[in-house]
UniProtKB/Swiss-Prot annotation:
Protein name listed in UniProt: Exportin-T
Protein family per UniProt: Belongs to the exportin family.
One Gene Ontology MF term: tRNA binding
Keywords: Cytoplasm, Nucleus, RNA-binding, Transport, tRNA processing, tRNA-binding
UniProt KW DNA-binding keyword: no
Amino acid sequence: MDAQIENAIEVAWNPSSSQELKGQAFEYLNQLRVDPQAWQVCIGLFTRSPPASEVVRLVSLEIINNAVHSEALDAASLVYLKQSLLEYIGRTYTSNTQSQVDPAHLQNKLTQTLTYLFVFLYREHWSSFVQDFYAIAQNDNLPGVILYLRILSSIHDEIADLMLSRQEQEAKRNSDLKDLIRERDMAKIATSWTDILSRYSNQHDGVVEMTLKIIGKWVSWIDISLVINQQMLGLLLPLVGRSNASGGEDKVRDIAVDTFTEIVSKKMKASDKIEMINFLQLREIITELLASPPLNEWKGTSQYDTDLAEVVAKLVNAIMSDIVRVLEDGKVDNDTRAKAEQLLQYFLPSLLRLFSDEYDEVCSTVIPSLTDLLTFLRKVRTLPATYAEMLPPILNAIVLKMRYDETSNWGLEDEQTDEAEFLELRKRLQILQKSVAAVDENLCMEFMSNLVGNMFSTLQQQGSQMDWRDLDLALHEMYLFGELALPNMGLAAKSQPNPVAAERLALMMSKMVDSGIANYAHPAILLQYMEICVRYHSFFESHQNYIPRVLENFVRLVHHEHVRVRTRSWYLFLRFVKTLRAQVGNVAKTVIESISDLLPIKAEVPSNDADDDMSSDESDHSADAVFNGQLYLFEAVGCVSATSATPVADQALYARSVMEPLFSDMSVHLERAKAGDAQAILQIHHIIMALGTLANGFADTPLGHTKARAQPAQEISAEFTRASEAILIALNQLNTSDEIRAACRSAFSRLLGVLGSAVLPQLPQWIEGLLSRSSSKDEMAMFLRLLEQIVYNFKGEISNILDLLLTPLLQRVFGGLSEPINGTDDEIQLQELRREYVSFVQVIFMNDLGGVLVSAANQGNFESLVSSIFSVAKNLNHGNLVASRIAFNVLSRMITQWGGPDIITPGENPVATGPPSPTIPGFEQFMLSQFHGVCWDVLQDGGFRPSSDATSRQILNEIAGIQQAIWMKTADLYINHVQNQLGQDSNDFLRTLTTTTARKPLVDWFLALLKGRK
């Protein structure tokens, strides 16, 4: 069998074997994995002499490992396997001849096998495990030492690695094994570490590295005194202090520092932790490391050792976090607290040195502990002088770290990744600065004020010679200053601004505008300038004399040669004029003339091979990005044109001057678009979007806004009616295009704000175009949402138009509701359409337009309408519950609208005042047979769970209201109907229904009924 297994392995891993043979070989090997006897053959293949090929031995060990790990072997078999491997190891690893030992990948697999054997045998059948392998590591036997260290590392990974999730039984087993190791062998293992370090510190760095890594792993779960002693310290300190004359990387030194970090990170009592930090002489170690050539003399050169800086930063971060944790502990004794405060003073300079390191990776490493420190200081009620003195150097380090370094070149394509990483670091630093402000707001205010003030003074002296990085830093701080000066910003939200900070900010803004910084050459500064103007737009409300100058700068910068400045400025220009439209004055003519060269639209169809993974600068060059930016300009034109300072006639003139070229362009491209030309279709799409966006700028208050809307001026409405007509022509001829319909729908929603009631006569055309046979359910839902807004805003004028358009509208919607479903996306769209449909009908009732639904023009749809509402109400599928609730509310409103007056009211002995008199003949019977029935259909649905679902509870509340309403409209007719349906079970229900107007008792009755049916 051994020859058969060996042959199968050779065939399976032989590149020249046929696929058929390989398949047979792998199938055979897979069978071996579940064969309870295969491991015995495999151990022979692994240990035999002369040895089999490496692949045969490796696969043999895998099969053995699988058998051991799956617990397929009994104790006797495990002991036999142990003896076989020990004999093999005795032959192979007891000689100091590297040539005969296994290669690394086989050693790894062998180590795994031995680790599994340790797990199952150490307790009872192999108590000498550690001693057996340590014995092999004696007498300078390097192969034995390496195998011993591999095994120790593997044992930790198997039983003590906290990063691995384990089953409860396995976790208990591992815990027991750790206890057993501590009891039997931990002292021996610790002794072996000192022995190996003593022997190999100046001979074999690989062995030293392995030993240090193992100490770092094991220290988290062993008695710390086994590691923290003079002998071990005497071995570790020289390794930490090793110097490399060549200035190259020293892995041993770095790992030794990491070992100290692991030791420091061990959980222990506060007093013990402080004593340990002192005993380990960590202050001296870190001071010497930071003063060593790799981190001091070679700073700023290619020899600077970033790896060493990072491991030292990890150590300092661990120490500082532990010190802060001790200080936060209210139960710590005074002596320990005093020592911790002294250590805090000792280590803070080292922390700030590493935080200020030119390499951001080093800085990021200590941010967690600095965050911990600032969080602790925020909790201290009255800051002692020793703590207060820490804040200025911390703040200074934070702010200086926000500066672009000397090697950075803003905006270059090949440095975009570095810049993105720096900006991400800036965000983290900003949080730290906020934390400092939360501790001492006045300190931050003074520091930032001085920094910005000094910057403007330097700019006045040096002008264009000033380093852009210093300007950028000061402007960035000015941007952040608002979190001190403005309300509801910063870590501690305030309802009122800080008056001193607000005054300082106003002074900064005045200096900035007066400084001429908008003419500075560097694009980063120009972007900061515009961002600040937009952020602090409220400054210009009280300093309107600055607006013309800033507006002139914006108009100039929207033409800037740098693509990032240019495209970003289009958005910022819109933000600026939109927030200050009441203050900018009559400047539209000048603005339009100045930016008219940026308004012509040139649609470009993206190529199929366009790079989806382009950088931000490249995407700014794309035609699509340029067009999106142009839309900001069109809206900005609308904003500056529609100011209160601009006569209405001029507003209309400006609108016409911008739209006429668009109309002409649309006419030119329409025929080509009808013929299917992709570029022409995209051009018309862009033109429609531009017209809608221009209208959005003119509209002072968006449609649907809760603020009362004024009817737009007739001159403005007339101009945009022309735009609406032009769009409708395009929609009529191109409505099979998804892109065109999407653009038209967007434009329609924006035009509503400037058309006012002039849109109403056009509604049938909009419905015809936007609800074509090509329209998706999603499009129908979005259009219904727009119609809801129109009904709400024009309820006094829309009745006749609604009467005219309702039948074709409902027929389109009914068609969408009845379409077959294909896939999850289709189901989601159908749910949305159901919800918007019943919401639309609800809005009709809420705005007293219910009569339209049963008018002469629409009564033919009445049955379909009610039937569709029933269908939505009864659908309790996931995602449809909200629509069901609205549908039941619609039914309730139908009863109120058409059920006639109440003829009975709840009480002890209610008496009807007369027969039912519905406004629609026969509606009382319709309510009893249909409305009442749909309620009970839902109550009997097994998926209806109002006791556990909030929306279902709301549906139940609507059902209770409907039952009460039907009874109050029909009195005895309802009672007889219920008694015929429920028999004697109806008595309790009717008593609950007829004695009170409150819904809750009836809801509770229904809940009890449903609970009893389970």
